[in-house]
């Protein structure tokens, strides 16, 4: 559905503008020809933006996410949660900055300010809705689905901050997606191993996991703390860069809302950690075996999440800044 919206919007945009390059579309939007064809062109652009909204699971285009995350096979869910979202954010940033540059003025109005405000509103809605609804979830995959919606909201803060410091904002988005990829893959790896052994994805059935398999419990804890933004996990640094970008773009109110949402999110992440380490279970005497290759995969990913939040922060962020500068050189 989302791909259909994107393709339909792009085909309409080509039909109305005769342009296939992003810079050519930007030139058309600033020309006299656009004023004669404004309504259909804006409709095509709206379809494209809505398509991106579905791709990144931003509210109010999120309604497919919880059901798909819960119903799809867990490996498929893991792929959708990281690869699709990261690629879609990369395309969204490229599209917005190329088609709506800061120099573009339509009817005396800087068009960039419009999508900056739109990104801010969508960020607030996505963060708040995702975190509040996640509080009542009983299925771990469904919880991570609403968490994914909230994560899209955090990332949209970086999109909103693009107007002020393009390179550092793109770097913040890139770092966050890089962190999110490792963190979410770690969480879903634990879910795959747990569900295969127990046949359950209920949060309550995670009770006593620290005694049934300490490695699985530790890996899930690191993943959840990273998603919650707790140091030294990578999520803390990722959120810091996004909040910093928002503050530097004079979006202080947006940054404050982001911090408040991060506190709410930390609560339901810690509830899961509490269940794994504190709650008792009748199945505590039934260990969950994990083969050696999976142990190595979990260990390497845990180390990667920690290193991304400590010694690898500067190298990865500097690489992202250089990449952002080269993207529009």
Language-model features: locations:
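Alpha-helical transmembrane segments of multi-pass membrane proteins predominantly involved
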Residues: 1-329
